[in-house]
């Protein structure tokens, strides 16, 4: 069957000139043909993500057309404005895929608001809400290597699409022939007909104003003299991040030159992920050279930000996603409490795999901390529930350990633009009182205990990878470990059991150990990986690290 589909593509008059040579080049290579055509990329709540190239299991204009036709079929049942917002990042063919999606929607009589240049995830979420759209599309593969691209779908609230809506869209996609089933006109024709319009300056300015309104101490940065090194990692963050920072008074910004402008090949780092050192190295080197107070790097779609801080002794230290989540929570709560802007019954939200240190900090300030499933849409869901109750102003902060933060209800996905602003403001504040981010972090550890949070990943590539991952997770359910190393398991939480957790079902297992440590095991939602999240508490960092290392060594054989 996959050979027949391959032959159909090979014989077709394909519009993308890159695809036919690829197809001709794999003729007779059964393994390669099978990998490209035996299955199709599956549309889920995170949309699509895959390697660029020819085939149903690849990202190309035909797969994008098919997906967009499925989305269009759903939009047409939703009433409302019959409008979809679109943005894209710097990845290879992101602009092509964005215009392709716009053209399919226009051919279906659906209006489109598309950015005239690359803009990040939060800008897409904002435009979806601003124009009261039925849906939004963000063409990106986040921090994946250059050979990937993807297609994130958003609901009318600017949050990633719900499970129910995604399932309906997927059904419609399956009814649509990938090569010729989608309605299609040219992008130019869609513009000429008035169906495709660019996002206006009114929307762009409103986005920046919404972010800048969330400063904790407005005006502080104008006189702080903060010195910053910033890298957009060749992605979409350059314009919005520098615009907001300049607006609030941070003007001493040095951009990492090799990573300044959009480049989907990501030639300076094979994996443009601000969680890893390789992506931050050039920025860190430049920070050391220039004596900057802070170095920030945003990922290609600018929804996550990595940080290196200057320590009192002049050295530089990377800050983890959990640490920055706690630091921002502490800064926002303390600052707003001091200034009288902390709402009554304030609410913060974190994912279940993020550090419990955040719970302790929230409790200290009288803030309700809610824990939700992994995936920022669940944080967005909590904002929506507050909004439905007329209490959206209670939301002050949400974060995930994977370097994603949000400090306001103006969008419903993580936002590296506001995160960059607040991190800089926080650094400027501590600088103004003769302290530093590093010193405040150590004060937090002294007050609440030395938490260590580490994520390990195990990769399962290829067609058999998903089956192997499923088998491992099922094995853990069928034969739960009584101990991990020499630490006894005292509690097991299976998030597929909705009655026990009070949350939607999820393929996540949490083990509580007799020494107070926790281990969370879950498959990645976007990559062929199983992730293990370790939280250990020790008298100092070395003690907490030693416990983590023992637990990781004991678990590793289960993932082979």
Residue ranges: model-predicted function:
Residues 4-101, 108, 191, 196-224, ...:
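An N-terminal, well-structured beta->alpha segment
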Residues 32-41, 149-279, 286-287:
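Gly/Ser/Thr-enriched, mixed-charge loops and adjacent short helices
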Residues 85-148, 249-306:
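N-terminal small/polar loop signature for handling phosphorylated ligands or for N-terminal nucleophile
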Residues 288, 292-294, 315, 335-522, ...:
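Phosphate-binding and adjacent anionic-ligand microenvironments
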Residues 37-57, 141-142, 228, 232-244, ...:
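Conserved phosphate/anionic-ligand binding catalytic regions in large, soluble enzymes, centered on
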Residues 211-212, 221, 225-245, 249-251, ...:
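Long hydrophobic segments that form regular secondary structure
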């Amino acid at each position: 069957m996959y050979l027949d589909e391959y032959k159909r593509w090979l014989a077709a008059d394909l519009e993308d000139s890159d695809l036919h040579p690829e197809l001709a080049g794999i003729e007779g290579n059964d393994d390669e043909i099978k990998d490209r055509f035996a299955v199709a990329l599956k549309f889920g709540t995170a949309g699509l993500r895959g390697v660029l190239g020819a085939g149903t299991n690849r990202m190309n204009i035909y797969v994008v057309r098919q997906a967009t036709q499925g989305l269009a079929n759903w939009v047409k049942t939703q009433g409302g404005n019959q409008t979809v917002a679109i943005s894209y990042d710097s990845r290879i063919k992101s602009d092509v895929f964005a215009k392709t999606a716009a053209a399919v929607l226009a051919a279906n009589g659906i209006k489109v608001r598309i950015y005239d240049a690359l803009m990040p995830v939060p800008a897409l979420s904002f435009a979806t809400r601003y124009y009261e759209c039925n849906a939004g599309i963000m063409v990106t593969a986040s921090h994946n290597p250059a050979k990937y691209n993807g297609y994130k779908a958003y609901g009318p609230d600017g949050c990633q699409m719900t499970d129910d809506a995604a399932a309906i869209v997927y059904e419609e996609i399956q009814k649509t022939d990938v090569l010729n089933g989608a309605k299609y006109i040219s992008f130019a024709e869609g513009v000429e007909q008035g169906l495709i319009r660019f996002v206006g300056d009114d929307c762009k300015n409103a986005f920046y104003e919404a972010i800048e309104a969330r400063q904790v101490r407005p005006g502080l940065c104008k006189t702080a003299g903060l010195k910053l090194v910033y890298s957009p990692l060749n992605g979409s963050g350059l314009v919005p991040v520098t615009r907001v920072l300049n607006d609030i008074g941070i003007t001493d910004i040095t951009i990492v030159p090799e990573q300044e402008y959009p480049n989907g090949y990501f030639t300076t780092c094979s994996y443009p992920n601000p969680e890893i050192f390789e992506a931050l190295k050039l920025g860190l080197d430049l920070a050391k050279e220039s004596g900057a107070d802070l170095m920030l790097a945003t990922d290609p779609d600018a929804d996550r930000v990595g940080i290196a801080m200057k320590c009192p002794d002049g050295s530089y230290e990377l800050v983890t996603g959990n640490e920055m989540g706690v630091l921002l929570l502490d800064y926002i709560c303390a600052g707003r409490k001091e200034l009288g802007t902390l709402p009554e019954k304030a609410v913060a939200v974190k994912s279940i795999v993020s550090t419990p240190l955040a719970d302790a900090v929230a409790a200290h300030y009288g803030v309700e901390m809610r824990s939700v499933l992994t995936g920022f849409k669940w944080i967005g869901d909590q904002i929506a529930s507050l909004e439905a109750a007329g209490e959206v102003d209670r939301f002050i902060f949400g974060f995930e350990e994977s370097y994603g933060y949000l400090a306001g209800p103006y969008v419903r996905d993580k936002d590296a633009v506001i995160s960059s602003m607040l991190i800089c403001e926080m650094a400027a504040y501590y600088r103004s009182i003769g302290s530093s981010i590093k010193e405040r972090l150590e004060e937090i550890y002294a007050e609440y205990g030395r938490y260590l949070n580490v994520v390990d990943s195990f990769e399962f590539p290829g067609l058999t990878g998903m089956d192997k991952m499923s088998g491992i997770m099922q094995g853990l359910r069928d034969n739960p470990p009584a101990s991990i190393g020499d630490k006894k398991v005292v509690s097991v939480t299976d998030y597929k059991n909705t009655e026990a957790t009070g949350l939607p079902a999820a393929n996540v297992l949490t083990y509580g150990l007799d020494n107070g440590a926790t281990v969370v095991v879950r498959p990645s939602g976007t990559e062929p990986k199983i992730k293990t999240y370790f939280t250990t508490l020790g008298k100092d960092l070395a003690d907490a690290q030693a416990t983590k290392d023992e637990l990781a060594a004991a678990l590793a054989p289960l993932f082979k």
